[in-house]
Structures are given as structure tokens and as C-alpha cells.
């Protein structure tokens, strides 16, 4: 018997942004799906507009599982995780152990199929970069949504994420920011005005 998917189903019980007041609580499961949507879009944009040659479906899959180890480690708040290089290094080691534990939960005959997804040492630098861009973008979008709902608690997080996005800058991210991000600050009525008949 394998408890792999029973564990993954518990990602919905792990709340993100645990130290901050949230107008709407976000869990790791829904965050992972949004990161998969955005990473897939970034990969397609890269391929179509900027002469990229990445596997958009694989990148979406990597993004879907990018926080899977948190079902074992929990979600450590970013300011703590990156407080200093020593903590960041040690937490990375903990994530590797959690990835290995997750993989070992699978039946032996399935482990080699999941290893390239769960073991981030088997991801290319380009794949990692796109998933990290999508992850940061989704955190930024969460800040915009919270700020639009009147929650000033996310002001500093938004400023920090703007720096992160600038550091991870890419043409596909610029395109996504220009074309898709403005809608996240609008109301349902405002975004519904553009729906074709």
C-alpha cells in the first residue's frame, strides 16, 4: 500500500503566508496549481515569442509538484527561510530529504517515473528558472489580490517580490506582467467586460 497521494492530498491543509493576516487564506495545493498555470504560460510565451525551445507540459508538471515536499516539511515563511545563507542551505537539505521520502512512498515500479519530477537535481537550469519565475509571480499576484481587498499587510511582501521579480527578469515574464497581471487588480465586473459574446 502506498500513502503517496494521501500525503499529497494534505497539501490543501497547509496554509501559505502563515505569519500574515489574509483576507483569503491560500493553501499549498491551490498555489501549486496556479504556479503550474503560470509556468506553462511562461514556457509557451518563451517558445512562441522569444525563440525558446522548452517543454511547456513538463514545466507545468514540475510546477505542479514544486512544493510537494512541504507536505513533510510544512511551509516555512520566506523571510525565515532566507534570513541568512546558513538557514537557506540547511533548509535546502531538509527539502532534499523530504523529496527522497516522498519518492520512497511510491511503489518501486513507479519511482523511476516520478524521480525526474520530484527530484529537482534532475531538472534543467532553464526549467528551474521558469518554475521559480512562476512561483514568484504567483506570490506577487497574491499580494495584489490582498492589497486590492484593502489588506495593507501585504505592502512589504509586494515590495520584496518586486525585487525578486526584477532579479529573475526574463522576456517571457515581462510579457506576462504586461498582458496578464493588470487584471489581478480589477473587480469581477471589470474583468468580465472583456469576455467575448
Curated annotation (Swiss-Prot):
Catalyzes the strictly specific dephosphorylation of 2'-deoxyribonucleoside 5'-monophosphates. It is an enzyme of class 3 (hydrolase). Substrate binds at residues 16-17, 31, 67, 75-78, 135. Its EC number is 3.1.3.89. Residues 28-140 form the HD domain. Its main location: cytoplasm. It is found in: Cytoplasm. It comes from the Bacteria. This is 5'-deoxynucleotidase yfbR. Keywords: Cytoplasm, Hydrolase, Metal-binding, Nucleotide-binding. A divalent metal cation binds at residues 31, 66-67, 135. Its cofactor is a divalent metal cation. It catalyses: a 2'-deoxyribonucleoside 5'-phosphate + H2O = a 2'-deoxyribonucleoside + phosphate.
